[in-house]
Amino acid sequence: MKFLSTSAIALALLANSAFAEGKLVIYHWFEYMPAELLEKFTAETGITVTMDTYDSNEAMLASLKAGGMGTYDVAVPGDYMVEIMAGEGLLDTIADGELANKGNISPEWADPSFDPGRTHSIPYQWGSTSFSVNTEDYTGDINTTDILFNPPAELSGKINVLDSQGEVMALASLHMGFPQCDT
């Protein structure tokens, strides 16, 4: 299943961002960016990077609303969260001409439904959600989501899913044959 997640970097969280000359403060998903990369960036640019992490879009939103606004220069919400945050006035607007390379965004990513015209976000990552099976432990049919939702006895206690409500609900919808964009 393809899922556009962590696809947007939301720039300058509201007007009172954490901007300070020579410093960059990032709010990013847990374990997405290695410390070595941040160290290399600092060595090459002289800009000190601080990164706080979160494990879900909802945790990020709650943290920002609980007093984290203005703490970060850049945050990395998933696609649907950009729309929520922009609707609540939590994101700054990217002015025309503000990002020199904005015109280099591939057309398929330039005008997403969650941020028309890319006024609050830019593409960052795209990924797929899937599942894998250790075929040494399980030799049955692996081409079905039934092994997740109606697991055979040999998989009992051996199934783990992402801690992401949206991802699991989308997978369950596919399993049950429901359309993805239906209410």
Predicted feature locations:
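Extracytoplasmic ligand-binding site segments that recognize negatively charged/polar headgroups
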Residues: 72, 77-183
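Sec/Tat signal peptide C-region and signal peptidase I cleavage site
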Residues: 14-20
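Early extracytoplasmic/lumenal segment of secretory-pathway proteins
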Residues: 21-84
